[in-house]
């Protein structure tokens, strides 16, 4: 399935985190945190400004990002993979 986000939306695949504590204990259930890092799979054309012009997004396909899961973040399954659909505003940083 092909999916194309609209406007300032971004599709991110969450990166897995290490499920062990610093002491080597394997964490499960609620003790294992979900990662707030992911790889950008697709981006919309940009944010529409009040004057009608389109401001391109800062993030690009392939960027590794750190994001905040907010009320507007949507989780979907696409081709068997769980992806997040979020606004670029929910992305806090690009990891180089």
UniProtKB/Swiss-Prot annotation:
Chaperone in keyword set: yes
Ranges in coiled-coil conformation: none
Family named by the database record: Belongs to the GroES chaperonin family.
Top-rank taxon: Bacteria
Chain ranges passing through the membrane: none
This protein's name: Co-chaperonin GroES 1
PANTHER family listed in its UniProt record: 10 KDA HEAT SHOCK PROTEIN (PTHR10772), CO-CHAPERONIN GROES (PTHR10772:SF58)
UniProt-listed NCBIfam families: PRK00364.1-1 (NF001526), PRK00364.1-2 (NF001527), PRK00364.2-2 (NF001531)
Molecular function via GO: ATP binding; metal ion binding; protein folding chaperone; protein-folding chaperone binding; unfolded protein binding
Gene source species: Vibrio vulnificus (strain YJ016)
Signal sequence bounds: none
Keyword Ribosomal protein carried by entry: no
InterPro entries the record matches: Chaperonin_GroES (IPR020818), Chaperonin_GroES_sf (IPR037124), Chaprnonin_Cpn10_CS (IPR018369), GroES-like_sf (IPR011032)
BP term (GO), one: chaperone cofactor-dependent protein refolding
């Amino acid at each position: 399935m092909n999916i194309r986000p609209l406007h300032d939306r971004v599709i991110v695949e969450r990166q897995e985190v290490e499920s062990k504590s610093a002491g080597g204990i394997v964490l499960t259930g609620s003790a294992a945190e979900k990662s707030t890092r992911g790889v950008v799979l697709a981006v919309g054309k940009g944010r529409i400004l009040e004057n009608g012009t389109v401001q391109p997004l800062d993030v690009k396909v392939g960027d590794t990002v750190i994001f905040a899961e907010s009320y507007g973040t949507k989780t979907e399954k696409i081709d068997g993979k769980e992806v997040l659909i979020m606004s670029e505003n929910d992305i806090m940083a690009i990891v180089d």
